[in-house]
Amino acid sequence: MPVIRTTEKPLGEGNRPDWCKVTSAGIFRVPAANGWFDLHYHDCDEYWLIYKGKAKVMSEGCEYYVKPGDIVCMQTGVEHDVLEVYEDLEAFWFEDATPPGGRTGHLHRDPSKAKKHPVPAKPLPADFPQ
């Protein structure tokens, strides 16, 4: 079984085993100081496994608080984003199989949203789940 060191290079075309159906996988970080992200969607399902930090994210038009141990599940075509962080956020992402004819990477309905935006660092809200 091969080992993909996603800390060095995300799993994707070129280092993905032939039998692997996952389109891509790796680690992303949004630091509390000078963090950036972009509103985007995919032609496949995507999952974020949060392992460090706390943040507010958006998916399906709804806002959610996330913390270590949470899995954010985004269906094909659903726009998602990181809205604000309360501490440095780190997560493992993977994009499920892309269907034939599907596109890979971050897709944007509005070209002006393709540019990353600053993610503000804010104090932890009182209603953040324990």
Regions flagged by a language model, labelled:
Residues T76-R103:
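Ligand-binding loop in jelly-roll beta-barrel domains
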Residues G61-T76:
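Short acidic-glycine-tyrosine-enriched beta hairpin
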Residues L39-Y41, E84:
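Non-cytosolic beta-sheet module surface loops
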Residues G101-Q130:
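Acidic/histidine-enriched, glycine/proline-rich intrinsically disordered or flexible terminal extensions
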Residues I50-Y51, M58, L83, F92:
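Beta-strand residues in well-ordered beta-sheet regions across diverse protein folds
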Residues Y41-V57:
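Short, conserved beta-strand element in jelly-roll/cupin
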Residues P2-L39, D96:
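A short glycine-rich, His/Asp/Glu-containing loop-to-beta-strand
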